[in-house]
Amino acid sequence: LLTKHIKKNIKDIPQIYVPYKEAMDVYENGLHVPEDITLVWVDDNYGYMKRVSNPKEQKRRGHSGVYYHLSYLGAPHDYLWLNTTPPVLMYEELMKSYNTGADRYWLLNVGDIKPMELGIKTFFDLAWNVDAYNIQNINNHQSKFLGHLFGEAYTSRFQNILDTYYQLAWSRKPEFMGWEREWDTKEY
């Protein structure tokens, strides 16, 4: 179908396979994905990569990529309005993926753009130049950006605010407040 409509050799047409949710089960149970197709690994919708390429997959011609969430709509609870993924967590998980071959394709699910602006900036800057960041400087990335926008003199104040915000928001996402019901797979 692709060859017919794009009029190129199938191996010259960039393609991805995203083993997300049910598709992960199919892949894990033996689905053959051609070598030139990029495997795009997904986080668990809460910032932790569910899987990265194993040594055999790292040798694939199609390499691998990541699909990362700053926003999520789905069960058991969605979070759509606030960016609560700490930059250090994003860095650790994306570098874990990058270091196992995820260098071909990075996708970020953001939902509403404006409240996710700092997370988007962190993700894009890291994707553009992974070597510019490390575990010591990634946490200051967002406060430096805000300092650049609003005045360098405020950078340390922004950092204190962001540190407190991420600590509180990560302990329990604000969108989850008021949800006291636990997820019961038998019920759903």
Q: Where are the model-predicted features located?
A:
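Conserved, mostly hydrophobic/aromatic
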Residues: 39, 97, 109, 145
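Flexible loop/turn segments at secondary-structure boundaries
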Residues: 22-27, 46-49, 56, 72-77, ...
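Catalytic-core region of carbohydrate-active enzymes that cleave or remodel glycosidic bonds
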Residues: 81-108, 122-133
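Ser/Thr/Asn(+Pro)-rich, low-complexity disordered segments
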Residues: 1-9, 24, 135-140, 144-149
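C-terminal non-catalytic alpha-helical accessory regions
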Residues: 142-188
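Aromatic/acidic polysaccharide-binding cleft in carbohydrate-active enzymes
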Residues: 107-132, 176-177, 182, 186
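Gly/Pro-rich turn-and-neighbor structural signature
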Residues: 1-61, 168-181, 185-188
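Active-site clefts of carbohydrate-active enzymes
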Residues: 61-87
